Amino acid sequence: MVLSWLFGAGAVFDAYVLAFRIPNLARELFAEGALASAFIPTFTRCLTTQGKEEARTLAGISASMIFLITGAFTALGIVFAPLFVNLFAPGFHDVPGKFELAVLLMRIMFPFLVFLALAAQAQGTLFASHRFGIAAVSPALFNIVSVLSGLALGYWFGAATGLSAVRGMAIGVVIGGAAQLGVQLPSVWRAGFGWRPKWNLRANLRNDGVRHILWLMGPAMIGNASGQINVLVTTNFAAGLRDAAGNVMNGPVSWLAYAYRFFALPLGIFGVAIASAALPSISRSAAQNNFAEFRDTLSRSVSMILLLTIPSAVGLAVFGERMIGLVYQHGRFHASDTHETALALTCYAVGLAGYAVLKLIAPAFYTLGDSRTPMMVSIASIVVNGLTAFTMIRFTGLGHAGLALAASAVSTFSAVTLLILIRPRIGGINGRALAVSALKITAAAAVMGVVCRIAGAYFPSKVGGLLMGIPAGIASFWMAATALRIAELREATRLVVSKLGLRA
């Protein structure tokens, strides 16, 4: 909301989006993606089989190496920022000052990679120790501190600091990363895993746990980064979209970015949360060769993800334009921007369940010591995404919305493929029960969609439609799911209540 009010959907925000996405790709390579996927299973196995002292040593060595590796990547990113911008958004040269602004902002924001990579390692340590509170809310702190500090530096006190609003927001991203790390460190120490930095590289590489993490991280960097690579492919196409007169458009990159922010909310609350909570249990089952428990935990978690994300996707599609208008349509963000962003959000929502399942299923392979399978599927998804995006732009006329739809199709393809491939590894995934559950959830979500449409028609205002439509949609889904006897409903209700802070 703050960014839309300050920058709208034009050249400045296009530059900001691209400048953020390149270091965010590196973040996905080292932080929430590859590092978490490799570190949590290895740390859990070490804690389970070798004890707390060895796990503490592994945590200290890992933190030291993460600092060195991400520090080196940050330095390279700052030096080669012009090359990255030219590679992923060559169309920026056609708008005076847009290319130079993107380079400057990227150089400012790249250091947040170091903080967030260390924060991801701290989060993995806490999850493996069954300490979910601070670790679960720390990503939200990143967003809050980034916005508030950015506003303070570039807007509220811009005259005193000499910073423009967009530069202030870029610096705020780095401060937010430091806050996400800092808030978790006391909990890490209380858990008994306080970091003891170890800088002897040769000795560090002799540690079995470190070698196992590095062995998993190579393919995992490709596997987990595929989503961000696909986003960059989408950005490349969007940055080159032209209007009827043949001029490069200002707006498509911003519309997709604003839509993805809304899309990421249920993805983070439900998909990432369920995956993060389930992964330590799955890792322990794999370490103990208890594949019956592994299979049950995985199947139950996938069902939970579907139960929460399918109705969320329907809600985004039905109420997307109202929500975007209410939150974003201020200052330089106009009604036309609201409409274009809502189109992209609807297309992203199609793939919400696929995106969320991927957050669980790819790391599940790493707990089995198999990093090759998700890597190969990810490589295939990058190719499929590029071809699908090209087809959408060239033949459908959907523009930026077609790019969002291509991304959704690819995420669903990847999730389904990985689910099929993991079946023989663990003796099945309770596929029949999972399919029946998915059909029931889809039917209940369809009922919810009809009710939401009716409620929206009776209350045409943005606020009125949302205040009446969302509760009506939730109630209708719950009643339909109860009537269809969806087994995961009770557990999902407890999760939602907990995430809303209504119980400890």
Which residues does each predicted region cover?
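Membrane-embedded alpha-helical bundles of multi-pass transporters/translocases
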Residues: 1-504
